[in-house]
Amino acid sequence: METLSVIHAKMLHVIYLLAALGIVFPLINTLRKQPLHTVSLWAVRVYTFVITIQFLIGILQLAARWGDYGDGLRYRLEHALIMFIAVGCVHMAPRFIKRGDAIGARNTTFLMVASLALVILGATLIQRAAQG
């Protein structure tokens, strides 16, 4: 369980990098008013996969250590809720990807930006809670 905890904590910068790629490639297609290309689709898919795995590891960790958190449980639950919404934003992207036009690329970009903003908010919340 400790290994999962370390992996969950250390993956933050990888998540930021993948989110940036998941934003930049669709943004390029949006600015060119084109549908999403293969590279953009793969960037979104990889980010979706990694953030989903990260969320599942976090939920597993929350369930396994439920009684150990004490007063910090509130922050852990807020973090989990924010990350759930971020994962929800990412999983709404295929709905717009299937459109196959520039509007789908734009909406996918908006969802990726919203997801990154929520990930930053959730990570900041849990880091501030750990500091006291």
Residue ranges and their predicted role:
Residues 1-132:
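Polytopic transmembrane helical bundles with strong interfacial aromatic enrichment
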